[in-house]
Amino acid sequence: MNIAPLVVRDEILLENLVLVDGQGGCGKTLFTAIVTAMDRVELLNYSPELENICALNYLGKIEDDAAQAMIRIQMDLVLYETMMSRRTNFRPADLSSVFRDVDFLTYVKRLFSKGDEVVPERIKEEKPILHFATHNLLAYSEPIHKALGKKVVLIEVVRHPLYMLIQQTLNQINHFESPGTARQFNIFIKHKDKQLPYLNFGQEELYLRSNPVERAIYEMQKISDLTESFKDKFKGSYGRQILTIPFERFVLDPWLYMRRIGDFLATKMTSKTRKVMKKQNVPRGRISDGIPLDIYKRCGWEPPEKELNEQQELVKRRQFAIEQGASKKAMSVLDRMCHDYEEKYLSTVSGLKRSAM
């Protein structure tokens, strides 16, 4: 009987990788725009391949050695092609479009520069920081850390659950029911005759008997719990490569976090970074004072009501859950998540606790 070989990729082109990770509606779009504008950071990319490898490993469908080798190959391939603009997105309206990048001309020049054999040496000289936005990845990211070691930094963006609830409810309606599932390039699992997002492994029956807003609440809870467990378990191993940033604190006073991002990535802010921050309205007077991007509107964003304070904005979002038919049990879960988040991240921020409820 043949013994299965160990799968490896010993050589690696990748110098540094930054993953901006978080749940739907947490504010990744804002963060990726700002991080991209820092020195040496590459144009924003998305990697369902990376997310799916980690998901399959979590589900026991891919062995550790295979997952780690695939991650090293995939990251090297993306970097290699990015350095020749083979992966550059020229669709003007896309968030990952080169037209939204502060170094637009860099990617145009790469189209006409020498590639292939000269790319590895250019990577060594320029030390580019590969940059991805990822979704709900931190809890399942052990294969990434094992594959890439200190080359990877993961920025976890967290946000008040009530500010993420509308988008995640819309996702349950638009993405996880036919025909929306055809545009979702992530792993699903089979339960009875239904397919479910793999994030609901272990709570399949709860998912199936819940309505969209309840599914959003229970999924949010599970991801949050798994993520906190991962951080606790691997604090000693990977803690220096994980930077958790509360959205609310960042948009009100970003400077400490910007310095920490620079330290984690061994890079720095530039005048272009400050220009992008101003465009994103950071810092801002109120948390809800976002900018009216089309992507935000499609995800349920509405401009804040001027007469409402921060606490009243939270009350309005909680009412959304009730109006969408959330059960008492689901509301209890939501309220507990909100309380825990407020105590952990917002206890010293004036006006951001729902004490009036």
Whereabouts are the PLM-identified features?
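Conserved phosphate-donor/acceptor-positioning beta-strand/loop module used by diverse small-molecule
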Residues: 133-135, 148-170
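A short acidic, amphipathic alpha-helical/loop segment
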Residues: 30, 140-147
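P-loop (Walker A) phosphate-binding loop of NTP-binding proteins
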Residues: 22-23
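PAPS-dependent sulfation machinery
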Residues: 46-132, 191-205
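Short beta->alpha connector loops
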Residues: 134-139, 283-285
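PAPS-dependent sulfotransferases, especially Golgi type II membrane carbohydrate sulfotransferases
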Residues: 1-18, 196-213, 217, 221-224, ...
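Long, charge-dense
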Residues: 175-199
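A conserved segment at the C-terminal end of the G1
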Residues: 28-41
